[in-house]
Amino acid sequence: MCGIVGIVGNQPVSERLVEALKRLEYRGYDSAGVATIDAGTLQRRRAEGKLVNLESRLREEPLAGTIGIAHTRWATHGAPTERNAHPHFTEGVAVVHNGIIENFAELKDELAAGGAEFQTETDTEVVAHLLAKYRRDGLGRREAMHAMLKRVKGAYALAVLFEDDPSTIMAARNGPPLAIGHGSGEMFLGSDAIALAPFTNEITYLIDGDWAVIGKTGVHIFDFDGNVVERPRQISTAAAFLVDKGNHRHFMEKEIYEQPEVIAHALGHYVNFIENRVVPISDAIDFGKVPSLAISACGTAYLAGLIGKYWFERYARLPVEIDVASEFRYREIPLSPQSAALFISQSGETADTLASLRYCKEHGLKIGAVVNARESTIARESDAVFPILAGPEIGVASTKAFTCQLAVLAALAVGAGKARGTISGEEEQALVKSLAEMPRIMGQVLNSIQPKIESLSRELSKCHDVLYLGRGTSFPLAMEGALKLKEISYIHAEGYAAGELKHGPIALIDENMPVIVIAPHDRFFDKTVSNMQEVAARGGRIILITDEKGAAASKLDTMHTIVLPEVDEIIAPMIFSLPVQLLAYHTAVFMGTDVDQPRNLAKSVTVE
């Protein structure tokens, strides 16, 4: 969500702060701002909209200073306006914040009763006023910071400047991540190591409850009670270069076409293609002995987990409990400490997923992380890390991370089946051969279907509602298709299990309703054809995504049929993801939306 950066050193910082913010654009934002201290005075520039607007403002009114903080805001309290953009100022205090101050209304009333005048609608402004109040009461800067942290409740990553201290940035973390970068004669602060990669690869991650005093030559870190603590330094592998679009119009398009390559890379970490076998999974989690598995995630990662559930239950005969992370820990699930739990998150910082992880950890479960960011909080707090190795994914709507999550889950399920003795050596070899074929088939599909997809997408762009249907692993894929379409084209779409059509959604079917049916010719195909006949009988416009055998067997008059190669069931979800992603992408292009940064969405959701 919001992005935070800070620099304290001997060189001008404003341009470097904006460059660092560009590396956080993938998180999503609606306004931005920078504050520096120059000649003993706090100064700031803010702008609504994209960073180019802030850059334009800085060209007109440059900011000097060798210390500063900057922020990209994703609105939670108050409209996305320049007035509500961070940094917030009051009485010589500047604050930027990622998170939600849950008791801000109570604090605001208290501060207003004491004479504080609020200029914005945000929850963050109470932090600045609290700090100013404690300074007026005679507390020093560190004491004021500690006192403020004792009062605020909720999730926060904070960076603070005091006008009377032009050599120090203060920071605090409770929930959203913060990384401190160590330089030569200068220090850095960022929401993640990616923002700091051009400046340093030596990183210290704050943990929940930590707060820090950062100077030019070092940092002092304290826990919530004010005790001095040490946090380890580590070398970050985050790339120092900004990823570009290459010859593609959008990052999302580029990332769709990268899938054959990144999936081949990911699978190479989990399977031995020469011997056609899976490599040993994990020493930390014994999949051969766990009685059950819990999976929790959000959004697209949750839908990957739903598909993974089918695989673990089918190939490993392992019972799987799965729920969206925002609900998982509220259900009081009877969890066995002998069991294991997998948490799926591209960023590794998803707040609800992290909270569910900690819930399972408290109950004694072994924890596995399926993440793209190996230095993330979820990875660091897990017993075993299963990297998806998708590389940087900039588009807010997940594409290559989704299919890499699926590839890793498929390999883990086969490995679990081998460990549990539920698949034979011959079955293992056959499944691995199918996985090995996947990158080639994906490349073949991507090179052949675009003209048909573009034609169909032009028609979809004129629709107001779209229904997706699927059975088996195609059911979560139908939900993913609907999610992708509404995320980036803003067309209302819903994904349903095909067997649920008669239990409500069929009431929506008419001649204006496109129904996208994902139906490889598998053991569910005949039943799905029956559902398509029900749609056709009511004038619905069927778009069938199937394989050669399915196209021949359906015998239906469809609006469009997209024909894919026949593949093994274990790789079908990844292959059938491709037309689903391209349909959403090209429809959004025809709609003229911001494909890479759709409205109201954030790449990394770091608050609950």
UniProtKB/Swiss-Prot annotation:
Q: Where is the Glutamine amidotransferase type-2 domain?
A: 2-217
Subcellular location per UniProt equals:
Cytoplasm
One Pfam family hit: SIS
Where is it found, in Gene Ontology cellular component terms? cytosol
Q: Biological process GO annotation list?
A: carbohydrate metabolic process; fructose 6-phosphate metabolic process; protein N-linked glycosylation; UDP-N-acetylglucosamine metabolic process
Give the enzyme's EC designation.
2.6.1.16
Catalysis performed (reactions)? D-fructose 6-phosphate + L-glutamine = D-glucosamine 6-phosphate + L-glutamate
**Keywords for the protein's UniProt record, in alphabetical order:** Aminotransferase, Cytoplasm, Glutamine amidotransferase, Repeat, Transferase
Q: Where is the SIS domain?
A: 281-422, 456-598
Which InterPro entries does this one have? GATase_2_dom, GFAT, GFAT_N, GlmS/AgaS_SIS, GlmS/FrlB_SIS, Ntn_hydrolases_N, SIS_dom, SIS_dom_sf
Q: Which residues form the active site?
A: C2, K603
Under the GO molecular function aspect, what terms does this record hold? carbohydrate derivative binding; glutamine-fructose-6-phosphate transaminase (isomerizing) activity
Known role: Catalyzes the first step in hexosamine metabolism, converting fructose-6P into glucosamine-6P using glutamine as a nitrogen source.
Q: Which PANTHER family match?
A: GLUCOSAMINE--FRUCTOSE-6-PHOSPHATE AMINOTRANSFERASE, ISOMERIZING (PTHR10937), GLUTAMINE--FRUCTOSE-6-PHOSPHATE TRANSAMINASE (ISOMERIZING) (PTHR10937:SF0)
Identify this protein by name. Answer: Glutamine--fructose-6-phosphate aminotransferase [isomerizing]
